[in-house]
Amino acid sequence: DLEDFSFSPTYLAFYDKLEKANLFLENILHFADQDLTDRETYTLLGSPLPDGGQWDMAISLIKKYGVVPSWVMPETVHSTGTAKYLPILNRKLREDALELRAMAKEGKDTAARREEMLAEIYNALCILYGQPPRSFDFEYTDKDEHYHCDRNLTPHTFLEKYVGNDLDDYVVIISSPIHALNRTYCQPFMGDVVEENMFWLNLSQEELEDLTIRQLQAGEGV
């Protein structure tokens, strides 16, 4: 019933960066026995905190953190352009990675130090994006000029009440002829949330085109 509404990309971008930092440190510890020049570790250190993502990554964030209206956590100078600060955070994460690798090789417990590192990333993101809200009042005027106020919503309760939980009804489809068709593939060590994985269903180009047309005809974007 709203004439104009948008979700906050800044809110999800904040947690996207935080979760990617956590996944980076998780992967660094997983490959702690490797040399720095080994393929996996070298690739990880090349881009600790990448921009962008895919459907599965967005859904993982939404399921874990919920969503908020754009005015609850608006854009900032840094949320609209990451080029100036990402090199700084990437350098910090590389330094953290070297420290955790050294601790792991010495047989030390890395959990507490890793939490401290993530807390530092969190604080930096708060400076860049603002601190994410724990709750908010959803105030709006509908098309009939009637005022509404839904108080003390959390990002999760807002998601459940106004968006729904059917996001898992969607799957990511690709068409890669160099891989077996009609199979689901998983890409390890990628994504944002450690607890989630990225999956793709590989179909023929003809099936991909047919499903695209049918989804558009059903009134849903692709």
Where are these regions (language model features)?
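Catalytic-core signature of thiol
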Residues: 2-222
